[in-house]
UniProtKB/Swiss-Prot annotation:
GO biological process terms held by the UniProt record: DNA restriction-modification system
Organism: Haemophilus parahaemolyticus
Keywords, alphabetical: Endonuclease, Hydrolase, Nuclease, Restriction system
Official protein name in the record: Type II restriction enzyme HphI
E.C. code: 3.1.21.4
Record field: catalytic activity: Endonucleolytic cleavage of DNA to give specific double-stranded fragments with terminal 5'-phosphates
InterPro entries, sorted: HNH_nuc
Gene Ontology MF terms in the entry: type II site-specific deoxyribonuclease activity
Broad class of enzyme this protein falls into: hydrolase
Keyword Nuclease: yes
Domain of life of the native organism: Bacteria
């Protein structure tokens, strides 16, 4: 990874999903519609300071957006604040540079009155379109999607989490020159090790931008924050377990885990006709090397024993990992008392092929069934 000062420049004028954020978006969307009505063929070449100044004036005229600063209450916001609020919408993916359009879900976001739905729409828009290197007059680059890149880096990390320090290191990446859609965790940690002093200096100098990004992540659906870490909501029990202090979590050996997953992929290729989910027989782009006996409860031999694993899709991995399903010695799926009937009806006929059920794997599955029974007994 190379260090660039074109870091992820996040701008926040208003809190996300607040009345002022929504009002700013509403005015921008209505103005863009007016521009398109007058000139249906409007493109970035038609953009001018006159068009931008008109938008600024409309935002300054909104009663909802009047200043709340002491001594300036009820007065129009200054131009710096107005520009910042427009760039916030551009960077987060709600409106396009040069005011050429807005996200296809922007109007639905404005119209919904239900907070849960608004949070979902916000998360999707930011995930699909956020580009923190944008400003109002930057040429669009659909390749660069910062939150998408960050979330994919999280998903591809076998530990299922990212630390705040790792996220700060990602902020130093110029995605315009990077070809992948995520950053391998071992390379990211090596970059941190080699650039500790620079990262420490960046933390002090760009404290606000780091705080803005951390705050944005807290607004995204299905992203769970604990102390200085994030993980997917569905993975939080696996990642953090029942422990309050993450320092007690057992650490995986990256190389041994790669070997473990590779062996499961080889087994899948041999018996499933390719690297596929061992249950669905589908070649998902992301497959999880799911432990049968939980990693945290395994000794060193068990932790990297491919017989103590199944290659699964994310959905089935979550159900299996959280003990909502298990399997008997014949490969038949077993239902937890905690699993809803509609989910069970969807998956119940999927089974493990007998060729995958060697004696060692059966022993691990017996342990897994006992864990499922224990979880059910708590309810």
């Amino acid at each position: 990874m190379q260090i660039y000062e074109t870091y992820w420049e996040i701008t926040n004028e208003y809190g996300y999903n607040t009345e002022r954020f929504v009002e700013t978006l509403k005015i921008c969307v209505e103005y863009i519609d007016e521009i398109k009505l007058v000139n249906p063929n409007y493109t970035e070449t038609d953009y001018s300071s006159v068009i931008y100044n008109e938008l600024q004036m409309r935002l300054q005229s909104s009663p909802i957006l009047q200043s709340t600063r002491k001594g300036f209450e009820g007065k129009p916001k200054n131009e710096t604040s107005i520009r910042k609020s427009i760039n916030q919408l551009v960077k987060s993916g709600f409106i396009n540079p040069f005011l050429t359009g807005y996200h296809s879900l922007a109007k639905e976001y404005l119209q919904t009155k239900v907070n849960k739905k608004r949070n979902f729409l916000f998360s999707r828009i930011v995930y699909e379109s956020s580009n923190f290197s944008y400003a109002i007059t930057d040429k669009p680059d659909i390749k660069v999607r910062h939150i998408n890149f960050l979330v994919n880096t999280l998903i591809e990390n076998f530990e299922g989490k990212l630390s705040k320090n790792e996220i700060i290191a990602l902020m130093l990446m110029d995605l315009r020159t990077y070809n992948g859609n995520y950053y391998p965790i071992d390379e990211l940690r090596n970059f941190i090790r080699l650039n500790q002093n620079y990262i420490s200096e960046f933390k002090e100098r760009k404290y606000n931008q780091i705080t803005y990004l951390w705050g944005l992540l807290s607004k995204l659906d299905e992203i769970y924050q604990k102390d200085e870490f994030i993980c997917l909501e569905e993975d939080k029990k696996r990642v953090f377990g029942d422990l309050e202090d993450t320092q007690y979590l057992r650490k995986r050996d990256p190389y041994l885990h790669r070997l473990y997953k590779h062996q499961l992929q080889e087994e899948s290729a041999e018996y499933c006709g390719g690297i596929k989910c061992m249950l669905e027989k589908l070649a998902y782009p992301v497959l999880i090397a799911s432990h049968i006996k939980p990693f945290i409860q395994s000794d060193d031999n068990e932790a990297y024993d491919p017989n103590n694993g199944l290659l699964l899709s994310r959905t089935l991995d979550s159900l299996f990992d959280l003990k909502y399903i298990s399997f008997d010695d014949n490969g038949n799926m077993l239902k937890s008392a905690r699993l809803s009937d509609d989910v069970w009806q969807y998956w119940r006929n999927i089974k493990l092929d007998s060729v995958l059920l060697n004696e060692k794997r059966k022993q691990y599955l017996k342990f897994h069934r006992e864990l499922m029974e224990k979880e059910d007994s708590k309810n």
